[in-house]
Amino acid sequence: MHVFIVYAHPEPKSFNGAMKDLAISELTSLGHQVKVSDLYAMNFRAVASRDDFQMPQDKDFLKYASEQGHASKTKSFSQDIQAEQEKLLWADFVIFQFPLWWYSVPAILKGWFDRVFASGFVYGKEIGRYDTGGLKGRKAMLSTTTGSPEHAYTPYGMDGDIHEKILYHINHGILYFSGMEPVEPFVAWTPSRDEKDRDRYLKEFQERLRQLSEIPSIPYHPSSHYREDHQLKDEYR
């Protein structure tokens, strides 16, 4: 299997770094081919701009999604965007390794999504979205760490349900929207507080990596389950 790891943490010796390193070594030992984008080490530019396009169609007014569509057709994205898109097309499975900051991904990873998951590449009129999106046929897993304990992320917890509120906008709004099939996320709860917990999480993560092809997918509705007004059909409610 081709596995692409997108890693977003500024400290190489962090627990996130340990998880990334474990993923590389474990997956390689299992015979998978692995590519990594270490966004901080790459100094990946998170800010969308005109510089993302080598052959802009409108030099006077930047309509970003339109320029993305044009660049997708003309293969004229900046080299850093093209390189990341090529890794996505190469991959069968993508792992996103990051700390949960402000109930979401670090800004550098959000910028990566903004620039790389482009109109005309992962979604658009000619491509579709959700189950027909440009990255269909690929699976993706969020692997994240938190600063609050697990019970804070339950349906009645102070921080909100980790699946339905915290990670939904990433799993459904980004990954599934692009055509990918998100699987159940791996969450390490407050790993900074206890060394025994860190060791346990690494062992659990190692076991998860060994069963990569067997991780259950999140059961989102396909586009065909919705009406033209984007509401779920009665029979699927």
Where are these regions (language model features)?
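Hydrophobic anchor at the start of a short beta-strand
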Residues: V34, P182-V183
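Glycine-rich, flexible loop/turn motifs
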Residues: Y40, D131, G179
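Structured loop/turn residues at beta-strand edges in well-structured enzyme cores
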Residues: L89, A107, L135, M180-E181
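Short, glycine-/small-residue-rich phosphate/pyrophosphate-handling segment
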Residues: Y123-Y176
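Beta-strand-loop-alpha "switch" segments that mediate conformational coupling across diverse proteins
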Residues: P185-V187
